[in-house]
Regions:
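Non-globular, low-confidence helical/coil segments that flank catalytic cores
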Residues: 2-249
């Protein structure tokens, strides 16, 4: 019981030792005894108010948990980067895989820093639209990066050239991912579900998004990039299990 009450908000407080502490406790005890009848009379006269006070006191005694960031044991975090995506998949104590980098370098850098990520085992750019790749420099500056993976459909061409230039400048090897490929990095295992062909209908870059079925710890996540109806139809025909989490544009 003592341990439980010690965990409630305000359950412990500084208290003077020795005679001063004893005198203070005695004074408080006398005050409670002298006001006890007045409190009882007040409760009888205003029962609703008295009940409200009791309920408020009871609620304050419920132990609370302090919210911290990052959450203990986090596995997958979707960064707030505004328009676009940046998903962090944990691979180790201070390492992760970044799937897309959003449009804003400071936003993705801040997200990774708050998660304590100093090493990116890989960066996967699902497709090459600006809202998924323009933040790349913020993710890779000042961090160890193992490899950069992109879709085999290198459109738009200017975004592809921008990504290539950043990779060369930072000495990061670049590869492409297609359906059937697999990534096993630390605590993460991922299977590539798409693209398996170039789809001319709809948005070619969107439908060429790298789709990852990710498992890290006990969490399954399906990261869809920006696939549209045509690629989604192909994906549904090939999907074999339901993930715990689905990320979609």
């Amino acid at each position: 019981v003592a341990r439980w009450f010690a965990e409630v908000p305000g359950g412990t407080m500084p208290w003077p030792d020795g005679a001063p502490g004893a005198l203070l406790l005695a004074a408080l005890t006398v005050a409670v005894l002298l006001t006890g009848r007045a409190l009882a009379a007040g409760a009888a006269a205003h029962p609703v108010l008295a009940l409200g006070c009791v309920l408020t006191l009871a609620a304050s005694l419920v132990p609370t948990r302090t919210l911290t960031w990052p959450p203990q044991g986090w596995r997958v975090v979707v960064c707030d980067v505004g328009q676009g995506d940046a998903v962090v998949v944990r691979t180790g104590a201070d390492s992760a895989v970044l799937v897309d980098a959003g449009p804003d370098p400071p936003l993705v850098d801040g997200c990774l820093s708050r998660l304590g990520v100093s090493t990116l085992d890989a960066v996967v750019l699902t497709h090459l639209h600006a809202d998924h790749v323009d933040g790349l420099v913020g993710a890779i500056d000042g961090r160890r990066v193992g490899q950069l993976f992109i879709t085999p459909v290198r459109e738009p061409a200017d975004s592809a050239a921008h990504v290539d230039a950043l990779a060369v400048r930072h000495g990061i090897p670049v590869g492409s991912l297609s359906a059937g490929d697999r990534l096993t990095l630390g605590e993460m295992d991922a299977v590539v579900w798409s693209p398996w062909r170039r789809i001319a209908d709809g948005s070619v870059p969107n439908n060429a998004s790298v789709v990852l079925a990710v498992r890290t710890g006990e969490v399954d996540a399906l990261l869809l990039g920006d696939i549209e109806r045509e690629a989604a139809h192909d994906l549904l025909l090939r999907l074999r299990r339901e993930p715990s989490m689905v990320q979609a544009a």
